[in-house]
């Protein structure tokens, strides 16, 4: 495997003898000035932003052949995904921090999750995405809770031309070696979108069907390693844009069914099946009005409705009948809803000073058999930031957020300061400090699940987690010349986290688990990213090295077998894209090496003493090769190989003792090498 890494590095070096680097993930010279909106007063280029932002544009998404957002992010530096194949869910990690510290936005509106696992990231229709903007580091002044590690803002497509456009897509993919045309085995996706814009009005609607038929299992298609997952997604949008007024309403809907078919009990020919059924609706009404060149108003209203049902049935193979089971927790319905109101005013006092005051109100409610007392939490916040430009080279942006929460003790004031200094036309320095916080999830506050095998309750006295974050970056970019561009980004960060919420026994003599503000943690690391593009060729190379430190609340009760403070893990990624203009074909190779991930776990030594051990998850390599060919004006074909190294599971030499869903010593990564082919149709009429 080391030879593979060296070969990739040498190959990129041939294309780019100067080994140059970049901060965004697009494969085009013109995209060095990509326009972004996340955390900005108004849309502006990456180069002008005070934040360090990564952008994954629609071309990169198309080139990947991905059927969900996780597949797009999986080869990005700092992103790792953990799969819980017991219940069919996936969570994200960003720069060493878990998904509960990452804010997921859809067009700037927070997406709701039932707990601290970011399942919502896999419940967005990838065919509607224009680009993904990633801001690393706390964004709590602008976006409130959960944005300790950063923000992932998914920007959907918008109609820009007066025309009628119809797009359709069918993609067939194997799951490892398993495949059957259109159903039964493999991965199948169908999509259709219709866009219409006339004068000031725009209308968009579309739908997608995703069908993963699982992977592995016995001869009867049961007891699968990867659970079957079927998704139906739909969306509609109507917009009006005239002069200073821009307003739109959008609705997104999802129905998802994850099926767990357990092995047959041959003594009575009966099997137990479970289905996890999710229904999600997300409404957003957004508008902006420009009073003058110096004064703009933007307002967002959002409402999300989320339901998740557990349905357990007893299937009798002799009678071919199904009946609902009656065991504790085997039939469950949990409901969550959220309301968001956000308004901001952008005012330019002068060429050197701009202000952005704002109001942010968030309300969350939950109910269900495992949620006690039908809780409601409301968060009220006002915030203000200002951009100060003493000259054309310096931009300083301090900000404050003031919070009042109806349930828990939130930090009363959240400060941040970001700065950008243009050291030259090609060299930019960014420095930042931010205080971040994460509010307790409803599940952590009010969860209640007691049966013969579980005794878990929430803790309504939890406090908000908080963090102090310091980060900086140095970005150098050449001026594009002769269709050639070079850029380099060197970034570093240091974060401390306090009052981290964790799952533990309520007392040493009890068998009841609950949540406490118990842990402290730190992350320290750096990234080096590179880009080279010339005519039809583009290449990227990146490296990260991130250290993690975690102090357990009961650490004094354990013997430490290693005095290391930080546990380190490396990553390396690379990509090459070449466009054969005459054949109207683009070839793409994406690669990522994920190094060993050490972690602190509890156990016992040879003397039966409780000890803190360092466990390691094995390193692994992922690579995809894809091609995109434009057959004619209307039809394009995409094809390729994913997971070239055929990675399915990696080893973990220890498992934490308080894992709720313990799948053993293997960590699921993927369902092996897979092949795909997709047919894309597009028709436009002015």
Put a short name on every predicted segment.
Residues 135, 272-290, 334, 408, ...:
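Outer-membrane beta-barrel signature, preferentially recognizing the C-terminal barrel domain
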Residues 438, 593-604, 628-686:
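C-terminal beta-signal and adjacent terminal beta-strands/loops
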Residues 115, 128-130, 141-153, 158-218, ...:
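Outer-membrane beta-barrel translocator/receptor signature
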Residues 23-62, 99:
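Short, acidic, small-residue-rich periplasmic hinge/interaction motif at the N-terminus
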Residues 212-297, 303-337, 662:
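Flexible loop and strand-edge segments within Gram-negative outer membrane beta-barrel domains
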Residues 167, 356, 391, 485-496, ...:
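Gram-negative outer-membrane beta-barrel transporters
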Residues 70-109:
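Extracytoplasmic beta-strand/coil segments of soluble accessory domains associated
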Residues 110-137:
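Short acidic/polar hinge/loop motifs at secondary-structure boundaries
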């Amino acid at each position: 495997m080391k030879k593979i890494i060296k070969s990739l590095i040498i190959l990129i070096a041939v294309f780019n003898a100067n080994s140059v680097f970049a901060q965004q993930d697009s494969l085009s010279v013109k995209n060095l000035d990509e326009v972004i909106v996340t955390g900005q007063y108004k849309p502006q280029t990456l180069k002008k932003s005070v934040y360090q932002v990564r952008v994954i544009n629609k071309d990169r998404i198309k080139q990947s052949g991905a059927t969900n957002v996780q597949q797009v992010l999986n080869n990005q530096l700092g992103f790792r995904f953990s799969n819980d194949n017991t219940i069919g869910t996936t969570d994200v990690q960003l720069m060493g921090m878990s998904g509960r510290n990452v804010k997921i936005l859809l067009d700037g509106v927070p997406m709701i999750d039932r707990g601290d696992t970011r399942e919502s990231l896999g419940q967005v229709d990838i065919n509607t995405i224009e680009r993904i903007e990633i801001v690393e580091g706390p964004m709590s002044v602008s976006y409130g809770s959960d944005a300790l590690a950063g923000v992932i803002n998914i920007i959907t497509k918008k109609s820009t031309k007066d025309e009628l456009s119809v797009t359709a897509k069918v993609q067939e993919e194997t799951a490892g070696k398993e495949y059957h045309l259109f159903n039964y085995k493999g991965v199948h996706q169908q999509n259709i979108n219709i866009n219409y814009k006339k004068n000031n009005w725009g209308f968009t609607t579309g739908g997608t069907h995703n069908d993963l038929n699982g992977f592995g299992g016995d001869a009867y298609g049961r007891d699968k390693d990867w659970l079957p997952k079927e998704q139906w997604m739909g969306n509609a949008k109507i917009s009006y844009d005239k002069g200073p007024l821009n307003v739109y309403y959008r609705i997104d809907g999802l129905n998802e069914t994850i099926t767990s078919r357990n092995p047959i009990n041959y003594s009575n020919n009966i099997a137990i099946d479970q289905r996890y059924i999710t229904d999600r609706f997300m409404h957003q009404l957004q508008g902006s009005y420009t009073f003058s060149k110096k004064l703009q108003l933007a307002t967002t209203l959002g409402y999300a409705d989320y339901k998740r049902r557990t349905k357990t049935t007893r299937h009798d193979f002799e009678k071919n009948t199904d009946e609902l089971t009656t065991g504790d927790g085997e039939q469950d319905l949990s409901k969550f809803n959220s309301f968001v109101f956000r308004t901001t005013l952008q005012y330019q006092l002068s060429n050197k000073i701009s202000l952005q005051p704002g109001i942010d109100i968030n309300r969350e409610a939950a109910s269900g058999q495992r949620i006690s007392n039908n809780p409601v939490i409301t968060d009220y916040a006002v915030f203000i930031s200002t951009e100060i430009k003493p000259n054309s080279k310096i931009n300083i942006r301090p900000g404050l957020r003031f919070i009042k929460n109806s349930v828990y003790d939130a930090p009363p004031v959240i400060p941040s300061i970001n700065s950008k200094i243009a050291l030259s036309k090609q060299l930019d320095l960014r420095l930042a400090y931010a205080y971040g916080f994460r509010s307790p999830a409803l599940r952590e506050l009010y969860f209640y699940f007691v049966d013969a095998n579980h005794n878990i309750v929430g803790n309504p006295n939890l406090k908000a987690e908080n963090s102090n974050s310091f980060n900086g970056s140095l970005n150098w970019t050449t001026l594009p010349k002769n269709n050639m561009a070079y850029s380099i980004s060197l970034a570093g960060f240091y974060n401390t986290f306090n009052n981290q919420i964790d799952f533990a026994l309520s007392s040493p003599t009890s068998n009841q688990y609950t949540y406490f503000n118990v842990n402290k943690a730190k992350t320290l690391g750096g990234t080096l990213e590179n880009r080279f593009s010339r005519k039809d060729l583009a290449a990227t190379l990146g490296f990260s090295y991130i250290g993690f430190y975690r102090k357990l609340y009961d650490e004094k009760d354990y013997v430490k077998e290693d005095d290391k403070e930080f546990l380190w893990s490396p990553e390396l990624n690379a990509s090459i894209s070449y466009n054969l203009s005459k054949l109207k074909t683009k070839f793409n190779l994406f690669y990522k090496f994920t190094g060993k991930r050490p972690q602190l776990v509890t156990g016992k030594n040879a003397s039966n003493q409780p000890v803190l051990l360092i466990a390691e998850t094995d390193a692994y390599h992922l690579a995809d090769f894809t091609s995109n060919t434009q057959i004619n004006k209307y039809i394009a074909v995409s094809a390729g190989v994913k997971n070239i190294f055929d990675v399915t599971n990696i080893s973990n030499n220890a498992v934490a003792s308080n894992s709720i869903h313990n799948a053993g010593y293997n960590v699921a990564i993927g369902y092996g090498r897979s092949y795909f082919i997709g047919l894309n149709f597009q028709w436009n009429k002015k």
